Swiss-Prot record:
Name under which the protein is recorded: Cytidylate kinase
GO molecular function: ATP binding; CMP kinase activity; dCMP kinase activity
Membrane-spanning parts: none
UniProt subcellular location: Cytoplasm
Keywords in alphabetical order: ATP-binding, Cytoplasm, Kinase, Nucleotide-binding, Transferase
Chief localization: cytoplasm
UniProt key word Translocase: no
Single GO biological process annotation from the record: pyrimidine nucleotide metabolic process
Family: Belongs to the cytidylate kinase family. Type 2 subfamily.
Swiss-Prot/TrEMBL catalytic activity: CMP + ATP = CDP + ADP; dCMP + ATP = dCDP + ADP
Enzyme class name: transferase
Protein source organism: Methanoculleus marisnigri (strain ATCC 35101 / DSM 1498 / JR1)
Length: 181
């Protein structure tokens, strides 16, 4: 089974992806972790690296091509990333997580050791940067959620509850796929 998990920064995509990968024994590819590692390798914070990526399309294209290639070749995998639901053409289940900006800023502040106001400004800038890049590189409007099978609020539900909901969807898909054989 191929599952993609997408959502804005701080929405909990990595937490849900790790939960599901552990529970179901699936491999996990995280575009965000690849992006963070590249930023570190370039000696930049994420905001500066995002600006760099706006002027160097090869950064996004490399990450996106890699997740597409891996996601479409693998059988039992979770691909977590902002565009994974759009890039992995043969995904069995596409999930989008949402949460308010204030909720996501609190999470990012806690995760990255920032004050909440700084995390909010950082998150808004990052979202603008990503939206610009995705529109310019791929013609994608990131706020269009039509490619996703499930849209869930990680502000309403914690990772265990989200996992339970997605577990039910996975079970339904598995039954459906078995019946189609």
């Amino acid at each position: 089974m191929r599952i993609t998990i997408s959502g804005p920064p701080g929405s909990g995509t990595t937490s849900l992806a790790r939960y599901l990968a552990g529970k179901h024994g699936l491999d996990l590819i995280s575009a965000g972790e690849v992006f963070r590692q590249l930023a570190k390798e370039h000696g930049m914070d994420l905001a500066d690296f995002g600006k760099f990526a706006e002027n160097d399309p090869s950064v996004d294209r490399m990450i996106d091509a890699r997740q597409k290639e891996i996601g479409e070749a693998a059988e039992n995998i979770i691909i977590e990333g902002r565009l994974s639901g759009r890039m992995v053409g043969n995904a069995d289940l596409r999930i989008w997580l949402s949460a308010s900006l204030s909720c996501r800023a609190r999470r990012i502040a806690g995760r990255d050791g920032m004050d909440e106001e700084g995390a909010r400004a950082y998150t808004e800038n990052r979202q603008r940067s990503e939206a610009t890049r995705y529109r310019n590189y791929y013609g994608i409007e990131i706020d269009d959620l039509s490619p996703y099978d499930i849209v869930l609020s990680s502000e309403t539900f914690g990772v265990d509850a989200l996992g339970t909901i997605v577990d039910a969807a996975i079970a339904c898909l598995a039954r459906q796929q078995a019946a189609d054989l």
